[in-house]
Amino acid sequence: LRAIARFAEYVVPFMGVAYVSVALIITIINIQLLPSVLLDIVTSAFGMQEAGAGALAAAIKNGIQRGLYSNEAGSGSVPHAAAAATPEPNHPASQGYVQMLGVFIDTMILCTCTAFIILLGTQTGIGEMEGIRLTQTAMEAHLGGIGSDFVSAAICLFAFTSVVANYAYGESNLHMFKLDNKIGRRFYTTGYLAMILWGSMASLPVVWAMADMALGLMTLVNVIAIVILTPTIVAVTNDYKEKRKANKKITFSEKDCHIQGELEEKDIWLGKS
């Protein structure tokens, strides 16, 4: 998992900075259209016509579903990578704040860049398109043929890091089911590769439906766990805030706050500062 994290540490920021830079260039070139685009976003989101037609509810539903694929907030997958990180200050709450920042950057910056790229496009027929083709067409209208190639390359890199990372997430949980052995890993790897093959061959609506169901179940289980662990979350957060307010060295100790259950590794937060 650490090797994957190191790989993503270089690839993901490069992709993100490149994508945001291109979006900024497109926005600056079309700066005169930006006010009308922002107005269109607001009126479309809160317009009475859309609300009356049920389009608002449909947009919220679709936004939540697709938003989870983007930032994975609340789904319980990213904490696997967060658990392998070395936070500074040396406290679980500080890593939690980092994860919150990641959701903000992904949603409010990267997704907003995509929205601007699409809405600033002036090509005809874009309203009938959806998904990656919509973004490719909009980028091509701004930058020519290289725009479509840029989006394809970015998607390939994002998809590759996602596939590799999610494999590691699943593999790290095998020990919870007492399957962290050669046979268990072999079955898991075979099943994972089989799902990738099926996903590449199945129709897009079926893939979306299957993914929506799986991600929904993940999120449901994780949210239930978060609710159950609320006392621990509050205690750990208060411990972090109190130490920061008192200008103490912020390190985590199980003795400083009450947590539910027991840590699987007692020294997990030692020697990481």
Positions of PLM-derived features:
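Select transmembrane alpha-helical segments in multipass membrane proteins
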Residues: 18, 49-68, 109-112, 117, ...
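Hydrophobic alpha-helical transmembrane segments of multi-pass membrane proteins
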Residues: 8-11, 21, 25, 53, ...
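Membrane-interface alpha-helices at helix entry/exit sites of multi-pass transporters
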Residues: 87-105, 180-189
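Extracellular/periplasmic helix-exit of transmembrane alpha-helices
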Residues: 22-40, 48-50, 54, 83-89, ...
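Membrane-interface loop-to-helix entry segments
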Residues: 1-34, 38-42, 208-238, 242
